[in-house]
Swiss-Prot record:
GTP binds at residues 19-26, 83-87, 137-140. The lineage of its organism: Bacteria, Bacillati, Actinomycetota, Actinomycetes, Frankiales. This is Elongation factor G. SMART domains: EFG_C (SM00838), EFG_IV (SM00889). InterPro entries: EF-G-like_DII (IPR053905), EFG_II (IPR041095), EFG_III (IPR009022), EFG_III/V (IPR035647), EFG_IV (IPR047872), EFG_V (IPR035649), EFG_V-like (IPR000640), G_TR_CS (IPR031157). GO terms for molecular function: GTP binding; GTPase activity; translation elongation factor activity. HAMAP family: EF_G_EF_2_B (MF_00054_B). One of its GO terms (cellular component) is cytoplasm. One of its GO terms (biological process) is ribosome disassembly.
Length: 698
């Protein structure tokens, strides 16, 4: 790779800004764009003017729904920022952006500390091993406690925080930060929106604390970096350069998390945080190579280095419809280089694609690029068959990169177009919106003929319906949200024998199968099929048909017609007829044998359980707990945080509809809650009876 291309790659940072809803992520991103000169005016979230929140729904609700990708530069480095949503209904956005990032900034609220969605996002980042720095925001707010936030990072996230700044003043007196690496104070000026700050000596009343925390910092880094440990053991005080280098090594290795603080809204502390992104977070060259597998051979590993001389490989991580250029596919290039007009292979689907325009995206405007190389994040136009998670690569050297894991939807609503014209538009809208978001699922209810859309929560579906109306002009009636129940079995049944026979004029149909059915112990998505037929009792070409029949039968369970999950089918034996056996006959036999077996295997209904966290004043604690108990909730823990009480509980989703209104009225609007999917659990018998009766129309 040419030296200048390598230098450009080393000076690139692909980062995400992640946090709980309302911790100030989008505001922080807006400040970054302001200080890096991309924006000339600061956009405020509460005024609906933030650059990154460019969908109408986001500007109205003041939350970020889609990850907008923006490029800016700082200290001669290119920073690609992905602003991710903190609302739990949009976890898929976080999941897909973490997959393509090299590093992240976790933003915490200095008042609330580590909140539930912060934990979820942190765990997602752990899964992809994304190095992180932390920014404790809102230091100017009443109740801000920096050290409590750092302690919570240890207790709740199992993180190793390396505090590199202390707050100078707190709440209304928050003036700046104390830099523990350079041992200086940084003071911000308010007249130029915090664009400049001065470096001063540490004031005497902070000197002792600064010295104590500096020692802790060196100790923490030394414990996680061999080179610094040697100096530490020799009793040598590290130089600024040595400490910076050790901090970088330990952060890139995901051993520590440097912690900074500030107030993005008050324009304090953002520039040092940008410095930390450049100084401590990895470039694509630090990440090195990416591993995939050969097409059709999952056990054959293929490695691609982050180098423009390597064959081209990229991952499509987001699809968006743009009113001006049509379908945009956001890609992260891992190796090689492409120019517009290049033919590439979608190796996931084995389809050829042609790259049209290549666009560098700022939050709501774009610039055309002739070509793009390893390490970059861009949007391309012209890909017809590519969806989220697909690999694009050089047709002469195919590879499939690791994709993403998306959670199954937990809630669905029926949707009916108001007119015939809406019916046609609905099809287009659903196709485009499901392309954009893989956690939306659409099916047609066989009995009612209604279109049913499923998603991750009420807000998720609300935004979906809203976008259909605004962007595609679809007027539709939306039903009440329904819970996505599942069915499973509790015991093993053996040798369930089913023969499918049909004799009419001409050739008939004949297939006999004998199966075992048992629980597979998965967590909501499992299915296994094992073939133990010997001696050609069922010809090899009919085995996949039995498997397909079983899978088809799983879609509608035997109790209330909900999908059946977590089962293992073993095909033990069977019979065929020289003339009358066919793929269809064995598919029907497999399906009917499966249903028979499921009825005998003690079937039960499962419901989604939500992890709920309620923050309430002490005097409403009893009402909140009583209400959660009345909703079949199981109280898991109670905590105290900043004068409020925190109640954690597991509650069935079916009991949580309309909870926001009930909680408001019970606590005079003083309590708040967050909820996220936890697991599926068996429904109590009395509740199951009602569900079954309703499903059967009794």
């Amino acid at each position: 790779m040419a030296a200048d291309a390598h230098a450009a790659l080393a000076a690139t940072r692909n980062i995400g800004i992640m946090a709980h809803i309302d911790a100030g992520k989008t505001t922080t991103t807006e400040r970054i764009l302001f200080y890096t000169g991309v924006n000339y005016k600061i956009g405020e979230v509460h005024e609906g003017g933030a650059t990154m929140d460019w969908m109408e729904q986001e500007q109205e609700r003041g939350i970020t729904i889609t990850s907008a990708a923006t490029t800016c530069s700082w200290r001669d480095h290119t920073i690609n920022i992905i602003d991710t949503p903190g609302h739990v209904d949009f976890t898929v956005e976080v999941e897909r952006s973490l997959r393509v990032l090299d590093g992240a900034v976790a933003v915490f609220d200095a008042v609330a500390g580590v909140e539930p969605q912060s934990e979820t996002v942190w765990k997602q980042a752990d899964r992809y091993d994304v190095p992180r720095i932390a920014f404790v925001n809102k230091m100017d707010r009443v109740g801000a406690e920096f050290h409590r936030c750092v302690d919570m990072m240890v207790d709740r996230l199992d993180a190793t925080p390396a505090v590199i700044q202390l707050p100078w003043g707190v709440e209304a007196d928050f003036r700046g930060v104390i830099d523990l690496i350079r041992m200086k104070g940084l003071l911000w000026h308010t007249e130029d929106k915090g664009a400049s700050f001065e470096t001063v000596d540490i004031p005497t009343d902070h000197a002792e604390a600064a010295q104590e925390w500096r020692e802790k910092l060196v100790e923490t880094v030394a414990e996680n970096d061999d080179e610094l440990m040697e100096l530490y053991l020799e009793g040598v005080e590290p130089t600024e350069e040595q400490l910076m280098a050790a901090l970088r090594r330990a952060t890139v290795a995901s051993k520590i998390n440097p912690v900074l603080c500030g107030s993005a809204f008050k324009n304090k502390g953002v520039q040092p945080m940008l410095d930390a992104v450049v100084d401590f977070l990895p470039s694509p060259t630090d990440i090195g190579s990416v591993t995939g597998h050969s097409v059709g051979k999952e056990d054959t590993e293929v490695v691609r280095r982050a180098d423009e001389d390597e064959p081209f490989s990229a991952l499509a991580f987001k699809i968006m419809s743009d009113p001006y250029v049509g379908k945009l596919t956001y890609i992260r290039v891992y190796s090689g280089r492409i120019t517009s007009g290049t033919a590439v292979l979608n190796s996931t689907k084995d389809r050829k694609e042609r790259i049209g325009r290549i666009l560098q995206m700022h939050a709501n405007h774009r610039e055309d690029r002739d070509g793009v190389g390893a390490g970059q994040i861009v949007a391309v136009v012209g890909l017809k068959n590519t969806t989220t998670g697909d690999t694009l690569c050089d047709p002469n050297s195919p590879v499939i990169l690791e994709s993403m894991i998306f959670p199954a939807p937990v809630i669905d609503v029926a949707i009916e177009p108001k007119t015939k014209a809406d019916q046609q538009k609905l099809g287009t809208a659903i196709q485009r919106l499901t392309e954009e978001d893989p956690t939306f699922q659409v099916r047609t209810d066989e009995e009612t003929g209604q279109t049913v859309i499923a998603g991750m929560g009420e807000l998720h579906l609300e935004v979906f319906v809203d976008r259909m109306r605004r962007e595609y002009g679809v007027e539709a009636n939306v039903g009440k949200p329904q819970v996505a129940y599942r069915e499973t079995i509790r015991r093993k049944v053996e040798k369930v024998d089913y023969t499918h026979k049909k004799q009419t004029g001409g050739s008939g149909q004949y297939a006999r199968v004998i199966i075992d059915l048992e629980p597979s112990g998965g967590d909501g998505g499992g299915y296994e099929f094992e073939n133990k037929v010997t001696g050609g009792r069922i010809p090899r070409e009919f085995i996949p048909s039995v498997d397909a029949g079983c899978q088809e039968a799983m879609e509608f369970g035997v109790l209330a017609g909900y999908p059946l999950v977590d089962v293992k089918v073993t095909l033990r034996d069977g019979q065929f007829h020289e003339v009358d056996s066919s793929e269809l006959a064995f598919k029907i036999a497999g399906s009917m044998a499966f249903k028979d077996a499921a009825r005998k295997a003690d079937p039960v209904i499962l419901e989604p359980m939500m992890s709920v966290e309620v923050t309430t004043p002490e005097d409403h604690m009893g009402d909140v707990i009583g209400d959660l108990n009345s909703r079949r909730g199981q109280i898991q823990a109670m905590d105290e945080r900043g004068g409020s009480r925190i109640v954690k509980a597991l509650v069935p989703l079916s009991e949580m509809f309309g909870y926001v209104g009930d909680l408001r009225s019970k606590t005079s609007g003083r309590a708040s809650y967050s909820m996220q999917f936890d697991s599926y659990a068996e429904v109590p018998q009395n509740v199951a009876k009602d569900i079954i009766a309703k499903a059967r129309g009794e």
